[in-house]
Amino acid sequence: MTFSEAAILANQELSQLLHVKGLIGTDYQPFEVGAGGDISSGIDLKAEEIFVKYLSPFGTILSEESGTFSHPTSSIEIIIDPIDGSDNLLSHLPYFGTSIAYMEEGKCTHAIITNLANGDIFIKNHEGLKKATLNHLFFENVTCNTFSKVGIFERSYCSQKILPKLHSLGLKYRSPGAFALSLAYAHEVSFVLYEGVMRTYDVAAGLFMCEDLHTYFKDDIFLVSKDKEIFDKISQLFISN
């Protein structure tokens, strides 16, 4: 079994758990603060267990929930966010997914991000960025959407620097609440913007998927856009200050 095949099977099992069996009481239960700094819920830990089962043969797993699951011999690191946007999931808001980054010598060479709400799955490796659905694994190349009307501004509700200035540009945006998943859609939307503390669980896979786009990643600001004009307009809001 290849790494991609294992990752797909893990996502399919998790999707089956969510959409067929459904959430139960313990899935909503909060547990301890996870390795990523957020409180893990029961469904976070269930999802992690599924990914560890499928991916542990390939290398050491670094999970946002429980931290490190060591591999005895492999130098490969696999960075996972078992549920990206778990607050959305627990609030029954259909925008949540999973993120997997396969790291060789500190560099991401293979990434899988899945939207568990609608089944979209994005995979990037040496063959480029491709997209399919979990139910129909017919992968097609991802190209830039030239008709996008909105961008994504994750965590806009707690923006300290950009939000007041962004309104002056007249750009439409949404703040759906799953950063890694939003990065997977960066070729579709006008831009993806984030202000705040960034963790490797959030950006490792998405940054690799966006490396062909215009990108700014420094301190607490992350901006990516397929449109150079929009990228320049937004980046000047914080580069010049």
Where are these regions (language model features)?
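An extended, acidic
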Residues: 140-241
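Buried hydrophobic positions in well-ordered alpha/beta secondary-structure cores of metabolic enzymes
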Residues: 44, 85-86, 186, 210
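N-terminal subdomain of lithium-sensitive/metallo-dependent phosphomonoesterases centered on the IMPase/IPPase/PAP
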Residues: 1-80
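Short secondary-structure junctions
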Residues: 23-31, 58-61, 130-132, 169-176, ...
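DPxDG-like acidic metal-binding loop motif
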Residues: 72-126
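Solvent-exposed alpha-helices and their adjacent loops that cap or buttress functional pockets
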Residues: 69-73, 91-92, 104-106, 115, ...
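A conserved active-site-flanking secondary-structure segment within enzyme catalytic domains
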Residues: 117-119, 125-136, 141
